[in-house]
């Protein structure tokens, strides 16, 4: 079993291939530019926004039983991801050396909906939000 150190070390020393392009991504080959895209609005974002308005109806049994890593994008979140991808294609028409996203469903959905040419996404455990264990997904009041 790989330790987190070994997984992180392997992550920092990978070669990425996209189409006819190859990029090294390691300590000595770090990119000059870094483009970060946050996931679009998710079920969790919607639930906590509604809670701030005093609406607790969104905290259904289904929502409460779903681990935060499985929260999906909302319709608005899918539209946000498509719009971000369109903006990137129109304004940053460059080859990216690596395409990396979190293993969370909402991040994977966002990556896919960006629809970037030649993107071969790598899921990385180190790119995720904080997890508060059993407290994750609870209304703030609790």
Where are these regions (language model features)?
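Active-site-proximal alpha-helix that buttresses catalytic centers in soluble enzyme cores
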Residues: 6-21, 25-119, 123
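N-terminal mitochondrial targeting presequence
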Residues: 1-2
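Short alpha-helix plus adjacent loop in nuclease-associated cores
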Residues: 127-141
């Amino acid at each position: 079993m790989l330790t987190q150190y070994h997984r992180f070390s392997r992550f920092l020393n990978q070669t990425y291939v996209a189409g006819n392009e190859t990029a090294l991504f390691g300590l000595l080959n770090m990119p000059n530019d870094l483009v970060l895209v946050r996931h679009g609005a998710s079920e969790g974002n919607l639930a906590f926004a509604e809670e701030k308005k005093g609406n607790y109806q969104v905290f259904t049994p289904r929502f409460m039983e779903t681990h935060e890593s499985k929260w999906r994008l909302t319709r608005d979140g899918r539209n946000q991801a498509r719009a971000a991808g369109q903006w990137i294609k129109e304004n940053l028409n460059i080859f990216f050396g690596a395409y990396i996203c979190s293993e969370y469903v909402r991040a994977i959905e966002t990556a896919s909906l960006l629809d970037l040419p030649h993107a071969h996404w790598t899921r990385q455990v180190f790119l995720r939000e904080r997890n508060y264990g059993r407290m994750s997904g609870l209304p703030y009041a609790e």
